[in-house]
């Protein structure tokens, strides 16, 4: 389905990359909220964020100040002129935010993963004209992400955007949440006019990763950033390690290199022709490989052999990984390529054996 979309920009906010939404992970006290907001406003930022209700993985942690925090956001709006935003997870949250005059809402990752919860929020938003951003679900499921956007769009909301905050994983070596950039890139391909805002705070999980992730986001051509900024991050009641001060945030934003999204030159066109030729050759060679795989499938059927020959598969992965490394390619990338090729070969051989 095609989404009916309108710009999410708010009056007085310049329509340029990056759109920046900044503020603390959680609204903790009125003083903390106002101090952070005033410092961000002094840096020229126009969009303030703060979590009012905080869904935690386990009970017992700080779960937000609740409705009381909405009054603090109203005061931020009054004192600084900034637009204010927060996360909603239930219909009641939506009603309370609309009553308080919140300017922008977002749906969190845990909520996006639950179609029932998303539909409840969509129903509560019917007849309302407010920008809504939808975070990716915690698991890497593009269809679930798009489905949440469709539900809210079906409720009549056209000022929609997506937030990419990475995906949960047991592998925490570098990132708190794996970026898996191919997923938001595919979202951009599928819905080209949908703004994509990235959340380097949640992807990185550490403040030292915020700056490089911000630059990577801009280099990929995404629209904006939602960044956690706290007046005293080390004392934050939630996600302290990934928050930065307003001064540090200002420094990061001033260092960003914003490259042009579209500018085709003659040299670039020639290089793209070479890429197209390589891709054509790849497809021809893959088709040839699959024909041979089908012949092998026929042989296995005739000789009552199992499809999976583990020794041969391990040999292919090891040899191709070494060959790729000699050609300057990442061994893990080569492994993934040949895993995908092997999966398709097995599928085609299964068809032959089951005929």
Enumerate the predicted regions with their spans.
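A structural motif
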Residues: 42-45, 102, 157, 222
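N-terminal amphipathic alpha-helix/helix-capping segment at the start of soluble metabolic enzymes
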Residues: 1-21, 75
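Domain-level signature for soluble enzymes in the chorismate/prephenate branch of the shikimate pathway
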Residues: 261-355
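Hydrophobic faces of well-ordered beta-strands that scaffold small-molecule active sites
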Residues: 18-24, 46-50, 84-86, 105-107, ...
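Catalytic alpha/beta core domains of metabolic enzymes, predominantly
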Residues: 13, 117-251, 255, 260-266
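Catalytic beta/alpha-barrel core
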Residues: 65, 81-94, 103-118, 130-142, ...
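Active-site mouth loops of central-metabolism enzymes
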Residues: 18-35, 59-61, 82-88, 108-109, ...
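Glycine-rich, proline-tolerant flexible connector loops at the mouths of alpha/beta enzymes
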Residues: 49-68, 231-240, 296-307
């Amino acid at each position: 389905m095609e989404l009916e979309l309108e710009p999410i920009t708010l009056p007085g906010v310049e329509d340029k990359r990056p759109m920046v939404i900044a503020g603390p992970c959680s609204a903790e006290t009125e003083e903390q909220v106002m101090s952070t907001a005033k410092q961000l406003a002094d840096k020229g930022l126009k969009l303030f964020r703060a979590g009012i209700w905080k869904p935690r993985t386990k009970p017992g942690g700080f779960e937000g100040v609740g409705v009381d925090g909405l009054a603090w956001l109203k005061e931020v709006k009054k004192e600084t002129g900034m637009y204010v935003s927060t996360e909603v997870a239930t219909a009641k949250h939506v009603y309370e935010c609309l009553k308080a005059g919140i300017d922008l809402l977002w749906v969190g990752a845990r909520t996006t993963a639950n179609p029932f919860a998303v539909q409840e929020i969509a129903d509560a938003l019917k007849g309302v004209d407010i920008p809504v951003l939808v975070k990716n679900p915690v698991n890497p499921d593009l269809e679930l992400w798009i489905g949440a956007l469709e539900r809210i769009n079906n409720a009549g909301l056209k000022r929609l955007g997506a937030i990419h905050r990475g995906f949960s994983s047991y592998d925490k070596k570098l990132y708190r949440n794996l970026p898996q950039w191919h997923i938001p890139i595919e979202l951009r391909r599928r819905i080209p006019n949908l703004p994509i805002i990235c959340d380097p705070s949640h992807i990185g999980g550490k403040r030292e990763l915020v700056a490089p992730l911000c630059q990577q986001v801009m280099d990929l051509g995404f629209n904006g950033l939602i960044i956690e900024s706290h007046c005293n991050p080390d004392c934050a009641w939630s996600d302290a390690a990934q928050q930065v001060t307003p001064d540090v945030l200002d420094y990061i934003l001033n260092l960003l290199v914003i490259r042009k999204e579209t500018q085709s030159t003659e040299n670039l066109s020639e290089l793209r022709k070479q890429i197209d030729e390589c891709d054509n050759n790849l497809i021809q060679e893959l088709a040839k490989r699959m024909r041979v795989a089908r012949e092998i499938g026929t042989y296995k059927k005739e000789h009552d052999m199992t499809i999976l020959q583990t020794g041969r598969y391990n040999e292919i992965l090891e040899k191709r990984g070494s060959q790729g490394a000699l050609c300057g390619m990442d061994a893990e990338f080569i492994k993934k390529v040949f895993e995908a090729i092997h999966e398709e070969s097995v599928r085609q051989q299964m068809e032959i054996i089951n005929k």
